[in-house]
UniProtKB/Swiss-Prot annotation:
The active site is at 110 (proton donor). It is an enzyme of class 2 (transferase). (6R)-10-formyltetrahydrofolate binds at residues 66, 91-94, 108. The gene is purN. Catalyzes the transfer of a formyl group from 10-formyltetrahydrofolate to 5-phospho-ribosyl-glycinamide (GAR), producing 5-phospho-ribosyl-N-formylglycinamide (FGAR) and tetrahydrofolate. This is Phosphoribosylglycinamide formyltransferase. The record marks 146 as: Raises pKa of active site His.
Length: 188
């Protein structure tokens, strides 16, 4: 059994999707030790409660430096014997402490076909670009913003009359298929 921690900052829909894949046996040999979130009062917390997944709420502003924040996280991760970190809507850059401790063992999913449209509002950027396709990317995490080695991508069309909400929904459904599939391949 491989222990993973899932980091999320907001909705937590990808977190919930991964946990449900594990709970239904579609993703075997993996245990989610906890949800790690950097915010209070966000939907991912309610999702974790409903799924009976432990929750760690750690706000960076409660620490005097990013390094101290990450050292605190590392103590929790170590106590839970976490082998992999899976980012699912975690809206912070991962710092050197976590990167060094989990080198090559942190995954992220991003709602664009990287290297296009890094960072926030990738869906909005894709719509404004005039591109006819976008998608989702699973990649290893490095010190940059959405710059790690790409593992796998899946694309969908951008329709001429798409609203942001319609395209977000289509990309989100890609992510629900893509992320568990990649996790099953990469995390053993």
């Amino acid at each position: 059994m491989t222990n993973i921690a899932i980091f999320a900052s907001g909705s937590g829909s990808n977190f919930e999707n991964i946990v449900k894949h594990i709970q239904t046996g579609q993703l075997s040999g993996i245990n989610v030790t906890a949800l790690y979130t950097d915010n209070e009062g966000v939907p991912c917390i309610d999702r974790a409660k409903n799924l009976n997944i432990p929750i760690h709420i750690n706000k960076p502003k409660d620490f005097s430096s990013k390094s101290l924040y990450e050292q605190h996280l590392l103590k929790l991760l170590s106590s839970e014997e976490v082998q992999w970190i899976v980012l699912a809507g975690y809206m912070r850059l991962v710092g050197q402490d976590l990167l060094q401790a989990y080198e090559g063992r942190i995954l992220n999913i991003h709602p664009s076909l990287l290297p296009k449209f890094k960072g926030l509002d990738a869906i909005g950027q894709a719509l404004e670009s005039g591109d006819t396709v976008t998608g989702s990317t699973v990649h290893y995490v490095d010190s940059g913003m959405d710059t790690g080695e790409i593992i796998e991508q899946q694309q969908c069309d951008i329709k001429p009359d798409d609203t942001k909400e319609q395209l977000e929904d289509r990309v989100k459904h890609l992510e629900y298929e893509l992320y568990p599939r990649v996790i099953a391949k990469i995390i053993k």
